[in-house]
Amino acid sequence: MLTAEDKKLIQQAWEKAASHQEEFGAEALTRMFTTYPQTKTYFPHFDLSPGSDQVRGHGKKVLGALGNAVKNVDNLSQAMSELSNLHAYNLRVDPVNFKLLSQCIQVVLAAHLGKDYTPEVHAAFDKFLSAVSAVLAEKYR
């Protein structure tokens, strides 16, 4: 469960990252495809080369959805319901992949936010991304 302090730290960090959604999202996806190549199977029609328009576009969507989750942190289930349905019923993404992408997002945030990505911010974002992953996996049960 996220504390009030966690929510504050998440909001503050997100304010610094929000204007870089396409860049950070593409970097996180590229990192995921490189580190966990099995994740590429969900994108058979994408040009998965780093910086491709499709990777940048999807990265922007992913981080845009994450921004929506930040805004609706107290009601993640409702805010992420449509995405949960899409990934569970249409795309049939294995929920473990949400955790893999979460790890890559953490690395990208740490790399770009530098000293602002304190251990406390890291811990708060870890809890937040775990909550988002759990909500995205809700429809699988």
From Swiss-Prot:
UniProt tissue specificity: Red blood cells.
Gene field: HBAD
Organism: Meleagris gallopavo (Wild turkey)
Keywords tagged on the record: Heme, Iron, Metal-binding, Oxygen transport, Transport
Domain of life: Eukaryota
One record GO biological process: hydrogen peroxide catabolic process
Entry's family note: Belongs to the globin family.
Oligomeric and partner information: Heterotetramer of two alpha-D chains and two beta chains.
Ranges of residues in domain Globin: 1-141
Gene3D superfamilies in the cross-refs: Globins (1.10.490.10)
GO MF term list: haptoglobin binding; heme binding; iron ion binding; organic acid binding; oxygen binding; oxygen carrier activity; peroxidase activity
Residues reported to bind heme b: H58, H87
General function of this protein: Involved in oxygen transport from the lung to the various peripheral tissues.
GO cellular component, one term: blood microparticle
The name this protein goes by in its record: Hemoglobin subunit alpha-D
